[in-house]
Amino acid sequence: AMGTEIQKYNLTEEDFRGDRFRDVPGMMKGNNDMLNITRPDVISDIYRRYLEAGADIITANTFSCQRISQADYHLEDCAREMAFEGARLARIECDKFSTPDKPRFVAGDVGPTNKTCSMSPDVSDPAAREITYDELFTDVCEQVDGLIEGGADARL
């Protein structure tokens, strides 16, 4: 999958940060979605290799491109941009390989978040929630909007 492919590049903390996120606190390595912004060459290369191998549909590198997950990295304000760029890069590569007889498609990846609105994080307070349904809905809608604007044909 995408994470395994990214690991093959042996990227450094500096690769993940790029110049733009140099001063953001905390570790960024492992936040694969930010590579849509900081290392689009790597992400595009991965997409291209899937298409060269014969893929008809490629999954965009957008699994955690919502504010909820990106808040752990202090990048919640970049979540929509990450989703957009992940889909846009995939769309560019798919368009290079598409033909009238064999179109290629982009599936925007909408992964789960690291917070849930269905279970309490506190065993002594079963009604407690880390996030509300409305917050979750709003964040996922923002991610999906970025995917659509970036050119995704479908959402996973």
Regions of interest found by a model, annotated:
Residues A1-L156:
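Domain-level signal for soluble alpha/beta catalytic cores
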